[in-house]
Amino acid sequence: MGILRDLSEADAEHTVVVAAFDHPARAELTTLDTLCAGNGVRWLPLRRERGRVIAGPAIAPGGIDFADVVARRRAASRELHTLDAIPPALGPGDLRWVLANVATHLERWLSGGRTAITTGEIELNPAELTEIRRPVLPVPDRARAVSAPASLIDDRTGIVTGLREIPPSPGMPARLRVCQADVADMRRVTNWPNDREAVGAAWHDFDLARQAAIDEAVKRYCGSWLAPDREVRFSSYEQLARYGVPALDPRRLKLYSAERYRSPGFPFAPLKTDSDCSWVEGFSHTTGEAVWVPAFLVSRERQAGEARFADPLPAGLATGTSAEQAVTSGLEEALAGDPTTLWWTGMPRLARLPIPDGIRSLIADTADGHEVTLIPLDNEFDVPAIAAAVFDRVARRLSLGFAVRPDALEAAKEALAEGFALHHTYRALDDERGLSALRREHGDLKPYRADRRYLDSYRDDFADVTDPLCLHQIRLDPRAGGRVAARLRNLPDRAWDDLPALGERRLKAYQDRVEARGFEVISVDLTTCDVAAAGHHVAHTLVPGLVSPLPRT
């Protein structure tokens, strides 16, 4: 078709432009998008790409636009620079089938009926007579309203672009199902260094592992970025208090010791009441009111010249299908992080739990190669917190999983799944090519060492440990795992009957325990507009006064 140059005379209420091309035509369609938007005209793109015919999305003023399509496909693409081959012309029968499908969707749209082209694209394959519906979510730095929830999973336009099962490695429990999620690369379309992969695990059920991987991908996606329209205040606590702005008192936070701050080369400054920093609005579930919190607790973004006070707290970031579910899961992480850190840094010799039959059956095929220790982590909130230590006898690698759940046995299963799943991460870190790929995403990882002596690569005070992956790399060093593993042997026994229980997995149940000890529950909503459009919520939950497992703690 020829390119429209002028729509100034068009009757916007009764005009719909259908733009058809026999190639991807992204530049032409982008130009047309601007023209139609400027004149308030609705339009429908129709193009061929990879031998398929792609119709949609149906574009109306104030809604989805073609820039969303370009951004989503660019971020999700695995072959960013691949040229699209020129497809053969459609035969008469194929063309009739395509036009009949497009006409049906077009008529539905114009008559106000339900059709997939109002929320995304339809990809038509004349050879197979199939139709694939692809969502086009809003791009977070260009927020817009959406008419209905859309999927966030799609290999061409999604946030999650792929899901695949990771088969069990030799010596790993066959009953543990592990799923890897591939995530769109938002660096291609905006200033957003999001994680490109996430892993989820579950016992027996791959659907649960798949959902765990999606949840992990979504929470990392939202947790790596603050939207440009997010209100951020740059001030000190004292200034905010002076103007009556409710804010979290820095003196309530437990970050680093005075000794660590004095350590030569330590990259962080202590946060004082007169320290200027960025603040974002959160919500206190304890008071029921808004409260401003230091932005660095939940985001890596800083203003020019802003001091560094800490990396974002690794515990507390979670997703859910409701805001309450996200906060509940985040609170479980925060409650697990506190006793975990106190145990890990102080290394008291705690008791161990006997392996119950229900768990022994899950790991029966790993008994020769792995040593499993379950440790209850007592805490002042009397919630079930379990650490699962998994020691690989052959590779001399130790992994640790932690979990809080209303029931101690469920917490143990969750922690054990995490502990075993981490060995997949270790294998990637211990592979020269795998590590090279990870270092492109996580620049603070050290270069590959065939001798695995990574303790020699990091500073003695671990001031250069800036990411949980750095901790995992250190644990590849047989000396690191060996030191801790020795502390896990010959522990006194403790009965399961002695452990606390919560009764139900609800926010109020946890919140009551936390507040009874004088602590406050705060959450910061980090849900991006595209994730919200897919029906998910992401929050970072904080409990001031608890210790979080900071990489350098």
Outline where the language-model segments fall.
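Helix-biased "structured C-terminal domain" signature
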Residues: 114-553
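Hydrophobic structural packing positions in well-ordered secondary structure
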Residues: 36, 103-106, 326, 411
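E1/E1-like adenylate-forming module used to activate ubiquitin-like modifiers
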Residues: 15-101, 108-111
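A short, well-structured beta->alpha microelement
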Residues: 1-15, 27
